[in-house]
Curated annotation (Swiss-Prot):
Anthranilate 2 binds at R172. Anthranilate 1 binds at G86, N117. Keywords: Amino-acid biosynthesis, Aromatic amino acid biosynthesis, Glycosyltransferase, Magnesium, Metal-binding, Transferase, Tryptophan biosynthesis. Its cofactor is Mg(2+). The keyword Glycosyltransferase applies. It comes from Prochlorococcus marinus (strain MIT 9215). It catalyses: N-(5-phospho-beta-D-ribosyl)anthranilate + diphosphate = 5-phospho-alpha-D-ribose 1-diphosphate + anthranilate. Mg(2+) 2 binds at D231, E232. InterPro entries: Anthranilate_Pribosyl_Tfrase (IPR005940), Glycosyl_Trfase_fam3 (IPR000312), Glycosyl_Trfase_fam3_N_dom (IPR017459), Glycosyl_Trfase_fam3_N_dom_sf (IPR036320), Nuc_phospho_transferase (IPR035902). GO terms for biological process: L-tryptophan biosynthetic process. Its EC number is 2.4.2.18. This is Anthranilate phosphoribosyltransferase. One of its GO terms (molecular function) is magnesium ion binding.
Length: 344
């Protein structure tokens, strides 16, 4: 079923700028999973893929192979699930916007299956902040899945579900560059969500990530690259979007000014340390946060409400998110999840 090309032949193709087809992409991932690629070869593959740029076929094929070895301990909930996991790696050191967005969207009725990890860069990862706020990430996998049914939101800690990739972590850290695995992370949620808002740190990722989501059968999705280089929709200016719907990609832009709100520089969203990040996240969720923090979360939550089919008008979604935040509903949702995952 898989490619007969040797590792060196695949590498030569990449170095010469040739895209990998479906079978070769799947074969390469299988070799990683089965320890058929040396550290030296892995470093070369990752560097060559980064230099060439990954395609939608390469990303979707590799992601499918990762998902094929990720077994669920219980049946997937029969729900329309949405994820807010992005690539990270924008280097902007903003507070963890996508995590706040997940709880805001859940408080508005979206069934959220949030996939995430600890930080692999200077930015605070979703798992870091949730651990600091007391969320139990060591409970049974059955409970993690059942939380979606019981609470309407759950968090899937990536290393627990993708143990086969742990061995690559030291090498990726040594390389110190964004690799194809940064792009694969948002594509390998074990619960295979029906819809997703996926932030990317590079404008070059918009089309391939959108194409990958399309090939993987996503019902609705938005891939977003924020003004100023954020991997979230930004308040600073024009944000570039790719809408995935009805088997097609549609390119668009949005600006916070479209929502009758003023533009605000990304620097207003920066945090200096873990404690600041935790405090900001809590203040946004309970409705006591700064206007810039609340607005950027509401803007991104509007995108989630669109992919979930709850609000087809982004302005309506933005206002719905603001109302929920001002009532403190997202923080109540967080506490429900925290208490549920802490129960024996």
């Amino acid at each position: 079923m898989f490619s007969n090309l040797s590792n060196s032949e695949i590498l030569n193709n990449l170095l010469e700028g040739r895209d990998l087809d479906d079978l070769t992409s799947r074969s390469l991932m299988q070799r990683w999973l089965n320890d058929k690629v040396s550290d030296v070869e892995t470093g070369a593959f990752l560097s060559a893929l980064r230099a060439k740029g990954s395609t939608g076929v390469e990303l979707s094929s590799m992601a499918e192979e990762l998902l094929n070895v990720c077994d669920l301990p219980v049946a997937r909930p029969n729900l329309y699930l949405v994820d807010t996991c992005g690539t990270g790696g924008d280097g902007a050191n903003t507070f963890n916007i996508s995590t706040a967005v997940a709880f805001v969207a859940a408080s508005c009725g979206v069934k959220i299956a949030k996939h995430g990890n600890k930080s692999a860069s200077g930015k605070v990862g979703s798992a870091d902040v949730l651990l600091n706020l007391g969320l139990n990430l060591n409970c049974s996998l059955e409970k993690v899945i059942n939380a979606v049914n019981e609470i309407g939101i759950t968090f899937l800690f990536a290393p627990v579900w993708h143990k086969s990739l742990i061995k690559l972590a030291p090498l990726r850290k040594t390389l110190g560059i964004r690799t194809v695995f940064n792009q694969l992370g948002p594509l390998v949620n074990p619960l295979r969500p029906n819809a997703q808002v996926l932030g990317v740190a590079s404008e070059d990722f918009l089309k391939p990530m959108g194409s990958a989501l399309l090939k993987m059968g996503m019902n609705r999705a938005i891939v977003v690259h924020g003004s100023g280089g954020l991997d979230e929709a930004s308040l600073q200016g024009e944000n570039k979007l790719v809408f995935v719907e009805n088997g097609e990609l549609r390119f668009s832009e949005i600006n916070i000014s479209d929502f009758n709100h003023e533009n605000i520089a990304n620097e207003k969203l920066v945090v200096s340390d873990f404690q600041s990040n935790d405090e900001i996240l809590k203040s946004v969720l309970n409705g006591s946060g700064q206007k810039s923090h609340i607005d950027v979360v509401a803007l991104n939550a509007a995108l989630v409400l669109w992919v979930a089919g709850i609000e087809d008008d982004l302005n309506e979604g933005f206002n719905k998110a603001l109302i929920s935040i001002n009532q403190g509903d997202p923080w109540k949702k967080f506490l429900l999840l925290k208490n549920y995952l802490s129960e024996n």
